From Swiss-Prot:
It comes from Staphylococcus aureus (strain Mu50 / ATCC 700699). It is found in: Cell membrane. GO terms for molecular function: carbohydrate transmembrane transporter activity. GO terms for cellular component: plasma membrane. The keyword Chaperone does not apply. It holds the Pfam family Sugar_transport. This is Putative ribose uptake protein RbsU. Its main location: membrane. Belongs to the GRP transporter (TC 2.A.7.5) family.
Length: 293
């Protein structure tokens, strides 16, 4: 692995690692966050399309790319709602675990991954380890009923949001276009969902006139940067799909730690140790699910 490939492979660490923290730092409600983040992603995607002169898909390729982006928009709205309940540092490991489970199960039952009994035993064991790791990251020494209630609500929300993230990753597999070509229509699908959600919230306020909404465009740049560098990293002449995926998953570590330290989402020393162990379990188990394909 060259230095250039490694640096590009760590791009998602920066983009996706800081995205939830930046979005939470700017504040606002989920409606402000999703509109700003998706507009930022769309701006990034338009600039990329112009610079690279990548084509624009048509027909079913366009439809599935739009559905992919719409899925992400739905999933991210739900995730922002979970941030309100338990904070980004607790929500990110859980949603990452659910996304890994969703992608892995789709790969097994729809794409024929993990052939053979041995591979399936190892794979499903790794998925159990991922769930254990996620549970460890949200463990708390404080047993207040309100904390437990918020955690349960957040987990249910994140589980629902996983259907959107699953669509984000699965829909492009039904197309014949590459990631760079799909990037712009995906961003368009994200914005469509965000705008619809914005109009659904018009009774309480006009989110399109709130300055926080447009400040959140910066958070969208972080997400888009992570997505772009992942697409490049996964190319065979760079890190390849397996290594690129594993490097991208390190973003959950940065997202969790920056949430704790930058957003002051406090953890006790014991909680911190258990959280780090949980993150390591998630990363190791995620690596296993990739290499047994």
């Amino acid at each position: 692995m060259s230095i250039v490939a490694l640096l590009i492979g760590l791009g998602p660490l920066i983009g996706w690692g800081f995205f939830p923290t930046v979005a939470s730092k700017f504040g606002g409600k989920p409606v402000h966050q999703i509109i700003g983040a998706t507009v930022g992603t769309l701006i990034f995607a338009i600039i990329l399309a112009v610079v690279t002169s990548s084509g624009f898909p048509t027909g079913t390729n366009l439809l599935f790319a739009l559905l992919s982006g719409a899925g992400w928009g739905f999933g991210q709205i739900i995730t922002f709602k979970a941030f309100e309940l338990i904070g980004s540092s607790r929500a990110m490991p859980v949603t990452t675990a659910f996304q890994l489970l969703g992608a892995s199960l789709w790969g097994v039952f729809a794409l024929g991954n993990w052939p053979g009994i041995g591979h399936k035993i190892i794979g499903f064991t790794a998925l159990v380890v991922i769930l254990i790791g996620a549970r460890m990251t949200v463990w708390s020494e404080r047993k207040e009923a309100s904390n437990a209630k918020n955690l349960r609500r957040a987990v249910v929300l994140l589980l629902i949001g996983e259907f959107g993230y699953w669509l984000y990753s699965a829909a492009p597999q039904a197309t014949s276009i590459d990631g760079l070509t799909a990037f712009l229509p995906q961003a368009m699908g994200m914005v469509i969902v965000a705008v619809i959600y914005g109009f659904m919230n018009m009774k309480s306020e006009n989110p399109f006139r709130n300055k926080i909404t447009w400040l959140q465009i910066i958070s969208g740049f972080f997400f888009a940067f992570g997505a772009l560098t992942y697409l490049i990293s996964a190319q065979p002449n760079m890190n390849g799909l397996a290594t690129g995926f594993i490097l991208s998953q390190t973003s959950v570590v940065l997202a969790t730690l920056t949430g704790i330290y930058f957003l002051k989402q406090h953890k006790t020393s014991k909680e911190m140790v258990i959280t780090i162990i949980g993150l390591v379990l998630i990363l190791v188990a995620a690596s296993v699910t990739v290499f047994i394909k």
